[in-house]
Protein backbone atom coordinates (compact mmCIF):
# COMPACT_ATOMS: atom_id res chain seq x y z
CA UNK A 1 0.00 0.00 0.00
CA UNK A 2 1.31 3.45 -0.89
CA UNK A 3 0.79 6.53 1.27
CA UNK A 4 1.83 8.90 -1.49
CA UNK A 5 0.27 10.75 -4.40
CA UNK A 6 2.38 11.29 -7.53
CA UNK A 7 2.98 14.91 -6.52
CA UNK A 8 4.00 13.90 -2.99
CA UNK A 9 6.31 11.23 -4.37
CA UNK A 10 8.22 13.80 -6.38
CA UNK A 11 8.40 16.28 -3.49
CA UNK A 12 9.81 13.72 -1.03
CA UNK A 13 12.62 12.56 -3.30
CA UNK A 14 16.08 14.03 -2.79
CA UNK A 15 16.81 16.62 -5.45
CA UNK A 16 20.45 15.51 -5.45
CA UNK A 17 22.46 12.87 -3.56
CA UNK A 18 23.77 13.74 -0.11
CA UNK A 19 27.30 12.86 1.02
CA UNK A 20 27.09 9.86 3.36
CA UNK A 21 28.51 11.98 6.16
CA UNK A 22 25.49 14.28 5.76
CA UNK A 23 22.85 11.65 5.11
CA UNK A 24 20.73 10.93 8.23
CA UNK A 25 20.14 7.29 7.25
CA UNK A 26 23.82 6.62 6.60
CA UNK A 27 24.83 8.29 9.87
CA UNK A 28 22.21 6.32 11.81
CA UNK A 29 23.12 2.96 10.28
CA UNK A 30 26.82 3.57 10.79
CA UNK A 31 26.19 3.87 14.52
CA UNK A 32 24.57 0.43 14.73
CA UNK A 33 26.21 -2.93 15.28
CA UNK A 34 27.13 -4.56 11.97
CA UNK A 35 24.58 -7.33 12.41
CA UNK A 36 21.73 -4.87 13.00
CA UNK A 37 22.31 -2.72 9.93
CA UNK A 38 20.66 -4.92 7.25
CA UNK A 39 17.44 -5.28 9.26
CA UNK A 40 17.11 -1.58 10.00
CA UNK A 41 18.09 -0.61 6.45
CA UNK A 42 15.33 -2.89 5.18
CA UNK A 43 12.86 -1.26 7.59
CA UNK A 44 13.78 2.20 6.34
CA UNK A 45 13.59 1.07 2.71
CA UNK A 46 10.05 -0.15 3.41
CA UNK A 47 9.03 3.15 5.00
CA UNK A 48 10.60 5.14 2.15
CA UNK A 49 8.74 3.00 -0.38
CA UNK A 50 5.45 3.54 1.46
CA UNK A 51 5.89 7.29 1.43
CA UNK A 52 6.96 7.49 -2.20
CA UNK A 53 4.75 4.95 -3.92
CA UNK A 54 7.71 2.65 -4.44
CA UNK A 55 9.86 5.31 -6.09
CA UNK A 56 12.37 5.91 -3.28
CA UNK A 57 14.48 3.83 -0.95
CA UNK A 58 16.13 4.86 2.31
CA UNK A 59 18.97 6.69 0.59
CA UNK A 60 16.94 8.54 -2.06
CA UNK A 61 14.09 9.81 0.15
CA UNK A 62 14.51 13.28 1.63
CA UNK A 63 13.80 12.48 5.29
CA UNK A 64 14.18 16.12 6.30
CA UNK A 65 10.91 16.90 4.48
CA UNK A 66 8.83 14.57 6.65
CA UNK A 67 6.24 16.23 8.86
CA UNK A 68 3.58 15.02 11.27
CA UNK A 69 1.09 13.91 8.56
CA UNK A 70 3.80 11.68 7.08
CA UNK A 71 4.93 10.08 10.34
CA UNK A 72 1.36 9.59 11.56
CA UNK A 73 0.40 7.89 8.30
CA UNK A 74 3.48 5.66 8.41
CA UNK A 75 2.77 4.55 11.97
CA UNK A 76 -0.87 3.78 11.17
CA UNK A 77 0.15 1.71 8.15
CA UNK A 78 2.85 -0.19 10.07
CA UNK A 79 0.42 -1.04 12.87
CA UNK A 80 -2.08 -2.32 10.31
CA UNK A 81 0.51 -4.34 8.41
CA UNK A 82 2.81 -5.83 11.08
CA UNK A 83 2.90 -7.30 14.57
CA UNK A 84 3.29 -4.61 17.22
CA UNK A 85 6.93 -5.50 18.01
CA UNK A 86 7.89 -5.13 14.34
CA UNK A 87 5.97 -1.87 13.98
CA UNK A 88 7.66 -0.52 17.12
CA UNK A 89 11.10 -1.45 15.80
CA UNK A 90 10.46 0.19 12.43
CA UNK A 91 9.12 3.36 14.06
CA UNK A 92 12.20 3.41 16.28
CA UNK A 93 14.34 3.46 13.13
CA UNK A 94 12.27 6.33 11.72
CA UNK A 95 12.60 8.32 14.94
CA UNK A 96 16.35 7.80 15.03
CA UNK A 97 16.76 8.93 11.42
CA UNK A 98 14.76 12.10 12.02
CA UNK A 99 16.80 12.77 15.15
CA UNK A 100 19.99 12.44 13.10
CA UNK A 101 18.50 14.84 10.55
CA UNK A 102 18.06 17.36 13.36
CA UNK A 103 21.66 16.87 14.53
CA UNK A 104 22.83 17.43 10.96
CA UNK A 105 20.77 20.65 10.91
CA UNK A 106 18.59 19.37 8.10
CA UNK A 107 15.34 19.83 10.00
CA UNK A 108 14.05 22.38 12.49
CA UNK A 109 13.85 21.23 16.13
CA UNK A 110 10.23 22.31 16.49
CA UNK A 111 9.20 20.45 13.33
CA UNK A 112 10.97 17.35 14.67
CA UNK A 113 9.05 17.49 17.95
CA UNK A 114 5.76 17.75 16.09
CA UNK A 115 6.64 14.97 13.67
CA UNK A 116 7.45 12.59 16.51
CA UNK A 117 4.48 13.47 18.70
CA UNK A 118 2.77 10.15 18.07
CA UNK A 119 0.77 7.80 20.31
CA UNK A 120 2.58 4.79 21.72
CA UNK A 121 2.06 1.57 19.78
CA UNK A 122 0.25 -0.90 22.01
CA UNK A 123 1.84 -4.32 22.38
CA UNK A 124 -0.23 -7.29 21.29
CA UNK A 125 1.55 -9.47 23.88
CA UNK A 126 1.65 -12.28 21.36
CA UNK A 127 4.61 -14.58 21.99
CA UNK A 128 7.04 -14.96 19.14
CA UNK A 129 9.03 -18.05 18.34
CA UNK A 130 9.03 -21.35 20.17
CA UNK A 131 11.18 -23.68 22.23
CA UNK A 132 12.61 -26.80 20.63
CA UNK A 133 11.92 -30.12 22.33
CA UNK A 134 14.66 -32.48 23.42
CA UNK A 135 13.59 -34.88 20.68
CA UNK A 136 13.94 -32.16 18.03
CA UNK A 137 17.40 -31.18 19.23
CA UNK A 138 18.38 -34.85 19.28
CA UNK A 139 17.14 -35.26 15.71
CA UNK A 140 19.20 -32.28 14.54
CA UNK A 141 22.32 -33.64 16.21
CA UNK A 142 21.72 -37.10 14.74
CA UNK A 143 21.43 -35.70 11.22
CA UNK A 144 24.73 -33.83 11.68
CA UNK A 145 26.45 -36.86 13.24
CA UNK A 146 25.33 -39.16 10.41
CA UNK A 147 26.88 -36.77 7.87
CA UNK A 148 30.49 -37.97 7.69
CA UNK A 149 31.69 -34.91 5.79
CA UNK A 150 33.46 -31.99 7.47
CA UNK A 151 30.22 -30.03 7.13
CA UNK A 152 28.51 -32.54 9.39
CA UNK A 153 31.17 -32.12 12.08
CA UNK A 154 31.05 -28.33 11.85
CA UNK A 155 27.27 -28.19 11.89
CA UNK A 156 27.13 -30.44 14.96
CA UNK A 157 29.46 -27.98 16.73
CA UNK A 158 27.30 -25.07 15.58
CA UNK A 159 24.11 -26.63 16.94
CA UNK A 160 25.91 -27.58 20.16
CA UNK A 161 27.00 -23.97 20.72
CA UNK A 162 23.60 -22.47 19.89
CA UNK A 163 21.80 -24.95 22.10
CA UNK A 164 24.40 -25.12 24.88
CA UNK A 165 25.21 -21.42 25.21
CA UNK A 166 22.13 -19.71 23.79
CA UNK A 167 24.14 -17.33 21.63
CA UNK A 168 22.68 -15.02 19.03
CA UNK A 169 23.70 -16.06 15.52
CA UNK A 170 25.53 -12.74 15.11
CA UNK A 171 27.54 -13.68 18.20
CA UNK A 172 28.34 -17.26 17.24
CA UNK A 173 29.78 -16.26 13.86
CA UNK A 174 32.15 -13.76 15.51
CA UNK A 175 33.72 -16.34 17.84
CA UNK A 176 37.46 -16.84 17.48
CA UNK A 177 39.39 -19.99 18.34
CA UNK A 178 40.98 -18.05 21.22
CA UNK A 179 37.50 -17.38 22.65
CA UNK A 180 37.01 -21.09 23.46
CA UNK A 181 38.51 -22.67 26.58
CA UNK A 182 38.17 -26.49 26.26
CA UNK A 183 38.90 -27.31 29.90
CA UNK A 184 36.04 -25.24 31.31
CA UNK A 185 33.86 -24.92 28.22
CA UNK A 186 34.07 -21.14 28.51
CA UNK A 187 33.22 -19.00 25.49
CA UNK A 188 34.15 -15.33 25.48
CA UNK A 189 31.45 -13.38 23.68
CA UNK A 190 32.98 -10.11 22.58
CA UNK A 191 30.90 -7.08 21.65
CA UNK A 192 27.55 -8.80 21.84
CA UNK A 193 24.30 -6.87 21.58
CA UNK A 194 24.81 -3.40 23.01
CA UNK A 195 28.57 -3.76 22.59
CA UNK A 196 28.86 -5.77 25.82
CA UNK A 197 31.27 -8.63 26.51
CA UNK A 198 30.29 -11.69 28.55
CA UNK A 199 31.48 -15.19 29.39
CA UNK A 200 29.23 -18.20 28.87
CA UNK A 201 29.87 -21.89 29.44
CA UNK A 202 29.12 -24.96 27.36
CA UNK A 203 27.92 -28.17 29.00
CA UNK A 204 30.25 -31.15 28.70
CA UNK A 205 28.24 -32.75 25.90
CA UNK A 206 28.53 -29.61 23.78
CA UNK A 207 32.27 -29.34 24.46
CA UNK A 208 32.71 -32.81 22.95
CA UNK A 209 31.17 -31.70 19.64
CA UNK A 210 33.27 -28.53 19.51
CA UNK A 211 36.43 -30.53 20.23
CA UNK A 212 35.55 -32.95 17.43
CA UNK A 213 35.24 -29.99 15.06
CA UNK A 214 38.61 -28.63 16.18
CA UNK A 215 40.22 -31.96 15.31
CA UNK A 216 39.11 -31.26 11.73
CA UNK A 217 39.62 -27.50 11.75
CA UNK A 218 43.01 -27.50 13.44
CA UNK A 219 44.35 -24.95 15.91
CA UNK A 220 45.18 -22.16 13.49
CA UNK A 221 44.13 -18.80 14.98
CA UNK A 222 41.01 -17.31 13.45
CA UNK A 223 37.29 -17.96 13.25
CA UNK A 224 36.08 -20.79 15.48
CA UNK A 225 33.46 -21.79 12.89
CA UNK A 226 34.30 -21.22 9.24
CA UNK A 227 32.81 -21.74 5.75
CA UNK A 228 33.59 -24.93 3.86
CA UNK A 229 34.04 -24.99 0.09
CA UNK A 230 33.29 -27.91 -2.19
CA UNK A 231 35.62 -30.80 -1.63
CA UNK A 232 35.75 -30.12 2.10
CA UNK A 233 38.22 -27.23 1.87
CA UNK A 234 38.04 -24.92 4.89
CA UNK A 235 38.14 -21.14 4.46
CA UNK A 236 39.71 -19.53 7.51
CA UNK A 237 37.27 -16.66 7.75
CA UNK A 238 34.07 -15.96 9.64
CA UNK A 239 30.72 -17.30 8.53
CA UNK A 240 27.81 -14.90 8.04
CA UNK A 241 24.63 -14.86 10.16
CA UNK A 242 22.70 -15.73 6.99
CA UNK A 243 24.84 -18.86 6.55
CA UNK A 244 23.81 -20.01 10.03
CA UNK A 245 20.14 -19.66 9.06
CA UNK A 246 20.61 -21.65 5.85
CA UNK A 247 22.54 -24.42 7.63
CA UNK A 248 19.83 -24.82 10.26
CA UNK A 249 17.08 -24.82 7.64
CA UNK A 250 18.85 -27.59 5.72
CA UNK A 251 19.46 -29.70 8.82
CA UNK A 252 15.90 -29.19 10.07
CA UNK A 253 14.45 -30.33 6.76
CA UNK A 254 16.55 -33.50 6.76
CA UNK A 255 15.74 -34.21 10.40
CA UNK A 256 12.01 -33.70 9.89
CA UNK A 257 11.96 -30.91 12.47
CA UNK A 258 9.24 -28.26 12.26
CA UNK A 259 10.43 -24.86 11.06
CA UNK A 260 12.25 -22.76 13.65
CA UNK A 261 14.53 -19.73 13.72
CA UNK A 262 18.11 -19.59 15.03
CA UNK A 263 16.79 -17.33 17.80
CA UNK A 264 14.55 -20.16 19.00
CA UNK A 265 17.68 -21.79 20.39
CA UNK A 266 17.93 -18.79 22.76
CA UNK A 267 14.31 -19.24 23.76
CA UNK A 268 14.98 -22.93 24.36
CA UNK A 269 18.14 -22.14 26.33
CA UNK A 270 16.37 -19.70 28.64
CA UNK A 271 13.28 -21.89 29.05
CA UNK A 272 15.28 -25.01 29.88
CA UNK A 273 17.45 -23.23 32.45
CA UNK A 274 14.41 -21.71 34.13
CA UNK A 275 12.72 -25.10 34.10
CA UNK A 276 15.80 -26.57 35.78
CA UNK A 277 15.39 -24.11 38.64
CA UNK A 278 18.16 -21.68 37.68
CA UNK A 279 17.35 -18.20 39.00
CA UNK A 280 16.31 -15.67 36.41
CA UNK A 281 19.19 -13.25 37.14
CA UNK A 282 21.75 -15.95 36.30
CA UNK A 283 19.86 -16.82 33.12
CA UNK A 284 19.77 -13.12 32.26
CA UNK A 285 23.56 -12.87 32.58
CA UNK A 286 24.17 -15.98 30.49
CA UNK A 287 21.81 -14.74 27.77
CA UNK A 288 23.33 -11.26 27.77
CA UNK A 289 20.02 -9.52 28.41
CA UNK A 290 19.99 -6.00 29.82
CA UNK A 291 17.06 -6.81 32.10
CA UNK A 292 15.44 -9.92 33.63
CA UNK A 293 12.19 -8.62 32.13
CA UNK A 294 13.60 -9.44 28.70
CA UNK A 295 14.66 -12.89 29.90
CA UNK A 296 11.15 -13.59 31.16
CA UNK A 297 9.80 -12.92 27.65
CA UNK A 298 11.97 -15.78 26.36
CA UNK A 299 10.26 -18.31 28.63
CA UNK A 300 8.36 -20.80 26.44
CA UNK A 301 7.63 -23.47 29.05
CA UNK A 302 3.91 -22.96 28.70
CA UNK A 303 1.08 -24.37 30.79
CA UNK A 304 2.93 -27.49 31.93
CA UNK A 305 5.41 -25.38 33.90
CA UNK A 306 2.56 -23.64 35.69
CA UNK A 307 0.86 -26.96 36.42
CA UNK A 308 4.07 -28.37 37.93
CA UNK A 309 4.66 -25.22 39.97
CA UNK A 310 1.42 -25.46 41.92
CA UNK A 311 2.21 -29.05 42.92
CA UNK A 312 4.70 -27.54 45.37
CA UNK A 313 1.84 -26.06 47.38
CA UNK A 314 0.99 -28.11 50.46
CA UNK A 315 -2.51 -29.05 51.62
PLM feature spans:
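Conserved catalytic core of the tyrosine transesterase superfamily
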Residues: 1-315
Amino acid sequence: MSLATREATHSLALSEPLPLTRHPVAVYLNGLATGSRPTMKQALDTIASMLSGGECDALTLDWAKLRYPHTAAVQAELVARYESATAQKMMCALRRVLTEARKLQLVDAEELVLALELPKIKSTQRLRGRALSGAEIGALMSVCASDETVQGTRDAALVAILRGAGLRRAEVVKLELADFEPETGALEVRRGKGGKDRTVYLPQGAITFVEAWLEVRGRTPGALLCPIRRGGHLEMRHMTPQAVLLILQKRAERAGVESFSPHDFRRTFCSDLLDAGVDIVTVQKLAGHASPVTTAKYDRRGEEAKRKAVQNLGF
